[in-house]
UniProtKB/Swiss-Prot annotation:
Name of protein: Holliday junction branch migration complex subunit RuvB
Family label: Belongs to the RuvB family.
Binding site for ATP: 21-22, 63, 66-68, 129-131, 172, 182, 219
Principal subcellular localization: cytoplasm
Entry annotated with the keyword DNA-binding: yes
A biological-process GO annotation: DNA repair
Length: 348
């Protein structure tokens, strides 16, 4: 995206202030009830046996708490925590430096693990399975293989795109955990806790208003809370209520469904310029002056989740709900526009 959006689930520079809002223990973590319960059992068992926890893979959309849970896992285990990301580990030597500095049962967190290079993955396999590094030292005839024993550690990987993980890497994670979008009630609890941490008063309806527009994502809820708090402070309000939250979020162009100006521009372009669709993703990328991957990975997922957009074999198609949200009349359309099977398209 050309501009950072307030409702993007991706991490932004101003999200650094979120650290204070993050829960420190599983008991404080809101949502993901089954995943939390299972993690607590696995952590308790590892502590009782005084063993390293099996490798953990967190899968889910951005902003749902994968990094926070990784930090909590290390804290609950009472071990060290090291964090990095797939793109940062450029070569096998970078990974070797990280692994050889880990203490017994430490947690190594790799965000965006699907972006590891094949060469780095090859080094990671024996490290995960046998806690050994197999490295080639030197080049040509003088090259030799060296085995280095590692401390037993726990690798925690996080990915938003599980389909890009290779099968050998995926199969080495003993504890796969899928994170789902949060309910409004769960987000209300997160907003209320965030307000307490920030020392800001908030009413139940004020928390609900922020939660409803947070797109099922705690990161967005925290970001909206901080911005609404600014409006409340400027108005000398004692607490954030629904009226203040509605005014602030309206001024920030986040509507009642959590859509921002870019979302509405996307929907309006299809509705007004292409009769509601179908229209290909390349056409939409050109119309909005945005790269195709931004359309597919950032804009469209939430619109599909809300039921405003369909991906059909012939292109993107607006639903009746989208026209109602835009306040437009739905045009009469040929049922054939939905394609033979109504499945997804490649977006060409």
């Amino acid at each position: 995206m050309t501009d950072p959006r307030l409702v993007t689930p991706e991490r932004r520079g101003d999200d650094l202030g979120d650290a204070a809002l993050r829960p420190q223990h599983l008991s404080e973590f809101v949502g993901q009830q089954q995943a939390r319960a299972n993690l607590q059992i696995f952590i308790d068992a590892a502590r009782k046996r005084k063993e390293a926890l099996d490798h953990v893979l967190f899968v889910g959309p951005p902003g749902l708490g994968k990094t926070t849970l990784a930090q909590i896992v290390a804290r609950e285990l009472g071990v060290g925590f090291r964090a990095t990301s797939g793109p940062v580990i450029a070569k096998a030597g970078d990974l070797a430096a990280l692994l050889t500095n880990l203490e017994e049962r430490d947690v190594l967190f790799i965000d965006e693990i699907h972006r590891l290079s094949p060469a780095v993955e090859e080094v990671l396999y024996p490290a995960m399975e046998d806690f050994q590094l197999d490295l080639i030292i030197g080049e040509g005839p003088a090259a030799r293989s060296v085995k280095i024993d590692l401390s037993k550690f726990t690798l925690v990987g996080a990915t938003t795109r599980a389909g890009l993980l290779t099968n050998p890497l995926r199969d080495r994670f003993g504890i796969p955990v899928r994170l789902n979008f949060y309910t409004i009630e769960e987000l209300e609890s997160i907003v209320k806790r965030g307000a307490r941490v920030l020392g800001t008063g908030i009413t139940a309806d004020g928390a609900n208003e922020i939660a409803r527009r947070a797109r099922g994502t705690p990161r967005i809820a925290g970001r909206l809370l901080r911005r609404v708090r600014d409006f409340a402070s400027a108005a000398d309000a004692d607490a954030i209520d629904r009226k203040i939250a509605d005014h602030a979020l309206g001024a920030l162009e986040v509507d009642a469904a959590g859509l921002d100006a870019m979302d509405r521009r996307y929907l309006s372009t299809i509705a007004l310029n292409y009769g509601g669709g179908p229209v290909g993703v390349e056409t939409m990328a050109a119309a909005l002056s945005e790269p195709r991957d931004a359309i597919e990975d950032i804009i469209e997922p939430y619109l599909i989740q809300c039921g405003y957009l369909q991906r059909t074999p012939r292109g993107r198609l607006l639903t009746a709900s989208a026209f109602r949200h835009l306040g437009l009349a739905e045009p009469a359309r040929d049922p054939g526009q939905f394609g033979l099977f109504g499945g997804e398209e490649d977006g060409d």
